[in-house]
Amino acid sequence: MFVDQVSVYVKAGDGGNGLVAYRREKYVPKGGPAGGDGGNGSNVVFKVDEGLNTLMEFRYNRHFKGKRGENGMSKTQHGRNADPLVIPVPPGTTVIDEDTGEVIADLTKHEQEAVIVKGGRGGRGNTRFATPRNPAPDMAENGEPGQERNIKVELKLIADVGLVGFPSVGKSTLLSVVSAAKPKIADYHFTTLSPNLGVVDTQDSRSFVLADLPGLIEGASQGIGLGHQFLRHIERTRVILHVIDMAGTEGRDPYEDYKKINQELSDYDEKLMDRPQIIAANKMDMPNAQENLIQFKNELEDDIPVYEISALTKDGLRDLLFAIADKLETIPKYEKELEETDDTVVYRYQKEEDPFHITRDPDGAFVLYGQRIEKLFKMTDFQHDEAVQRFARQLRGMGVDKALREKGAQDGDVVRLLEYEFEFIE
């Protein structure tokens, strides 16, 4: 089954916890703190594998979770960083954040990688908190939570040439005779339910990748029929091969077919009309084809080459394939509009979120929430009094106490943070 669009949940690994420990060795009085830091959690990485051409990996597994970093150990030994979770994807994969619509990655080259969510930093051990005033701190940090996202993964096949046309004009037959691909062929509409790829080798030892897409019908760009689901795959083809049933076997006018398909491409993306086109006048072995071709050329206003072929009898295919190969030699391979090399770091300004927000529940409890305050809470080890006191100081420094008083909080009021409750004390 061909899968080219799927929603996925990804969660990077949390950082390992720091450790509270002390040196206890003979002849080492006042050994001091010796708790190590936790290891970093694993990143979730998408990596291009050119052997794949579908998102089948995601069909039955739509939740990916990275491993947690190792906890810190005694004798100031740091925990081990977790290995990244590497997920193979086909070339042409685009990753989009479902909540913001931001394009996270556009993967087009073999072995290209992108970090989709970043693993959490390991928590610091008590060695890191030693100061002259507190040489033996009884506190450590929990690991930072790993990032998590709901993402949409889309595949836009990277083929040199894309076959377009109405259903049953002979696209699949053409692909089957010029390549080793074996698409399903039958005498009814929408026999092709998903894209098929084939490698074409010309007689002069040139080659290119040809994509057969489900047939388009009028209104495809608005979601009518099946072809609209796969219009995105045309975006990365370098040449559009427009296959037309020149015999008009279903009673349609070939020139009207040509205009309607181009209109659908234009409605989907106007830039597609700038893509080089070659017209394959198919079924020339059938009655009325020659007369229709003469009429077609008389009405054709565009300066587009027309090649007479019969996919069934294989007539005219040599000249058509040579023309496609010649055209491809003049067109650069697909590149992203905004090319970012591995050496380039793009900094985007992002407005800093407020560290916390306060709302009030119907029962009168005050609710604290916000990315920063929730992160501090999760990284606090509440089993040690010094860590609790540090968390209280952090809240005071952020202005949480003052903000609660301004909201009307009084002694004994309940304050909620995540699934925990606290008592407000003036």
UniProtKB/Swiss-Prot annotation:
Main subcellular location: cytoplasm
Subunit text: Monomer.
Keywords carried by this UniProt record: Cytoplasm, GTP-binding, Hydrolase, Magnesium, Metal-binding, Nucleotide-binding
Record region (Disordered): 66-86, 119-146
Protein name per UniProt: GTPase Obg
The keyword Hydrolase is assigned to this record: yes
Record-listed Mg(2+) binding positions: S172, T192
Protein EC: 3.6.5.-
Cofactor: Mg(2+)
HAMAP family xrefs: GTPase_Obg (MF_01454)
InterPro entries in the cross-refs: G_OBG, GTP-bd, GTP-bd_Obg/CgtA, GTP-bd_prot_GTP1/OBG_C_sf, GTP1-OBG_CS, GTP1_OBG_dom, GTP1_OBG_dom_sf, OBG_GTPase
Lineage start: Bacteria, Bacillati, Bacillota, Bacilli, Bacillales
Pfam families xrefs: DUF1967, GTP1_OBG, MMR_HSR1
Domain OBG-type G, first and last residues per copy: 159-329
Role played: An essential GTPase which binds GTP, GDP and possibly (p)ppGpp with moderate affinity, with high nucleotide exchange rates and a fairly low GTP hydrolysis rate. Plays a role in control of the cell cycle, stress response, ribosome biogenesis and in those bacteria that undergo differentiation, in morphogenesis control.
Family statement drawn from the similarity comment of this UniProt entry: Belongs to the TRAFAC class OBG-HflX-like GTPase superfamily. OBG GTPase family.
GO terms of biological process kind: ribosome biogenesis
Native source species: Oceanobacillus iheyensis (strain DSM 14371 / CIP 107618 / JCM 11309 / KCTC 3954 / HTE831)
This protein's GO CC annotations: cytoplasm
Protein location: Cytoplasm
